[in-house]
Amino acid sequence: MDIQQGGNDLISLAATIRTELQQKLSSKARIHLPFDEDRTEFDKANLRFTQYERPTYLAIVDPVCEDDVIEAVKYARGKGIPFTPRGGHHSVTTTMGRFQNGICINMRPLNQMRWYAEKRHVTIGGGAITDEFVRFVHDLGMEVTFGAGLGRLQGKYGFLNDNMVSCKLVLADGSTVIASKDSHPDLFWALRGAGHNFGIALEATFQVYPQAHGGIHHTWDLEYTLDQCDEVFRTLNSVYESMPAELAIFILWLRQSSGRKHIILVNLVWSGPAAGADPYVQRFESLQPVLNSGRKSVPWPELPFSTYKEINKLFCNPEIWLRGPYKMMGAACVERFDLKTTREFFESVKSLSEEWEDRGWFSAMFECLPDQRVREISDDATAFPWRAGSNHFLMLNATPKRMEDRKVFEDHLNYWKRRFIETSGYGRLQQYVSYGNGTSTMKDPPEALYGYEPWRLEKLRNLKQKYDPDNVFRWYQPLLEP
């Protein structure tokens, strides 16, 4: 039953939640309900990158301090009401669709940041988003890997979670712990790769590093036709064999660009002195792109909004999200790009883009990131399972305008996900957890998200039993099925 369609029992329950929970929160904390006369704040917090297989909320809590989060957790547990935190509203994971008519704890107000110069540590609140964090760190003259845990600087610094120093967490019973290498080290291990199964992060502290080259990064966008696909990916495979820590490469499919249709865009980012990029840029320029942006040199915080034709300005704009509300994703990881599979995939995207031009969109983004520091760290150092097996991350995207057409779009994603797995070089799905379960019609097993080694899954499950025996945190990419 959907409260937004008028279920009387749910309306009554939502009103009760506000009455009872508001008394336990600080005076400036707010609770928003879907039937409020002025729905502005509820609608703002309810907005989401995709409406496909989305969760629904009886109430959305805006905390103003950590105690508000703790009280909301204790209240929900005591009443047997499901609850979930949320931050940047960007999840595409369909497992969240199981969460219906619960309490949403909007973490965005807890976006405070602190700097400890002596140790070069930055502490960020659980509601901070990427742009806020990156600008704060950049203004300090520092940097670290950032992205979805992965990032362009991982060849230098490892993953973002490799640089976590500690995390303050609300557990399922409402208690708080600080996990670090010296305090609850078992939980600290689990947080770095599977943390959403164990609690709500109130804040986390990270090691950061002095900026190289004044925090300036250099970027090139080069566009190719579908006829050039084999040459592009043959070159990419070759470059990756000796890819330096300063280089990161993204590949995108664009339905149209600069008056041309069906374009493969190669974005190169170089984090060292500009001249060092020349041998790699020249490899791609020698393929005769139909458009070459030339070099752009930008500060680190502007990089996401300067690369691949500034598309992130759309992805990060909530006002744009509802223009294509039903975003779906299929993802996989490959050791090398199989030329035949990759070309046939783009041919399929072109064909479907033409056939369904007025009824939806098809696209893709491939991430090819350096791994020097990533692989220097022991494979068992954190819960992240793919330190030695995660060369290229593939995100296949499809967005129908109407859910009546969903099957065509889901089938496309599922088919090509299977094809890429078959030719991945790994012989199985090795899935970055934030990219998993992008359609509701093809399930990623826990092993694909958390690792196939028996010891790794056993350790995680034992820790789950220790810290969340009732499987309260079971909505986002659950380690254990609800």
Curated annotation (Swiss-Prot):
Listed pathway(s): Secondary metabolite biosynthesis
Cofactors (names): FAD
Enzyme Commission (EC) number: 1.-.-.-
Keyword Flavoprotein belongs to the record: yes
MF annotations from Gene Ontology: FAD binding; oxidoreductase activity
Domain of life: Eukaryota
Class of the enzyme per the UniProt entry, highest EC level: oxidoreductase
Keywords: FAD, Flavoprotein, Oxidoreductase
Pfam families, sorted: BBE, FAD_binding_4
Ranges where the FAD-binding PCMH-type domain occurs: 53-211
Purpose of the protein: FAD-linked oxidoreductase; part of the gene cluster that mediates the biosynthesis of alternapyrone derivatives. Alternapyrone is a decaketide with octa-methylation from methionine on every C2 unit except the third unit. All the domains in the polyketide synthase alt5 are apparently involved in alternapyrone synthesis, that is, the 8 CMeT, 7 KR, 7 DH, and 4 ER reactions in the 9 KS-mediated condensation steps required for alternapyrone synthesis.
Similarity field: Belongs to the oxygen-dependent FAD-linked oxidoreductase family.
Protein name as annotated: FAD-linked oxidoreductase alt4
Native source organism of the sequence: Alternaria solani
Lineage, highest ranks first: Eukaryota, Fungi, Dikarya, Ascomycota, Pezizomycotina
Gene that encodes it: alt4
